[in-house]
Amino acid sequence: MTKKDYAKITWPIFFQLISLPQKLTGLMPLLFGFAYAQYAFGRIDWINTLLYFLAQFCVALFVSGFNHVQDFKKAKDSKYLETTNIISYRHLNPKHVLYLMFSFLLIACSIGIILVFRTNLILLFIGGAAIFVAIFYTAGPIPLSRLPLGEMLSGPVEGFGTVFIASFINMPYLPIFLSFHSEWIVNLTVNLAVLFQLLLVGLPFAILDSTVMFADNICDLKQDIKNERYTLPFYLGKKKAVQIYPFWPSTALLFILISVIFNICQSGVYWFFFYYPG
């Protein structure tokens, strides 16, 4: 295919490329993290909140477009390319799409550096780990999405990780604080009580995010096998995977009830869950 054969990225194609409806539902962990910070700590830093909102949205845009390109490159099934992968059936230039997506990632990382200076250095390592998973989820010789670990990694990063950072940047006293001193002395201060609270309220989002991916992988099992993508349902078998599926959202509900019963989070804050896919 020559350059003249490639289609231009119009706004309708761009919205399809970034999976816009999924981006809107993906904002729920982010908004919940902001809401929980206000509820639990009585404080919202509006500058940090706006910065992280923009950074997280740019990361979400990057992930969608980047994944489409990687899936296009690694695809084995011609029918998948003709009907499912937008890079292929829309005749988009994969290089141009990558340039666009990495521009979003650059914006997100730049904002992240600003947030590190406004909070603490530990955020650099937390955010760096999240970006690592975002890139190598579909990239590399053995992408994470083609392993049975996909659900276990995407859920904690996209679900819990987003809730954690959204709360972290708004806390008056950070639960994790990293500092460097003279003579190569490093101090790491951790408030286990606050971290446990964040873990408890963030786990439902991690579980539900994994549930959505697990359901998608069950539905796409035949197509994934043709593309040599061996996810968790492949190893479990479709029948067993379908049997296990209902327990995932039930586990999320259990953690919600525990949070409400022990007054870690009020039930009203969880209204976001009614709009969360699963």
Predicted features, each with a name:
Residues D77-T119, R229-C265:
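Multi-pass membrane catalytic core of lipid/isoprenoid biosynthesis enzymes
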Residues M1-Q56, V63-G65, P141-S145, S154-G161, ...:
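Topogenic membrane-insertion module of multi-pass membrane proteins
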Residues Y89-S179, E183:
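Intramembrane alpha-helical segments
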Residues L30-F32, Y36, F41-V69, L124-I135, ...:
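Membrane-embedded alpha-helical segments that form the functional core of polytopic membrane enzymes
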Residues S154-D216, L221:
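Functional transmembrane core segments of multi-pass inner-membrane proteins
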Residues F15, K23-L27, T49-L54, L98-F102, ...:
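Hydrophobic alpha-helical transmembrane segments
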Residues Q56-T83, L208-P233:
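Acidic (Asp/Glu-rich) catalytic motifs at the cytosolic membrane interface
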Residues T2-A7, V190-V194, V201-G278:
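C-terminal membrane-associated helical module and adjoining short loops/tails
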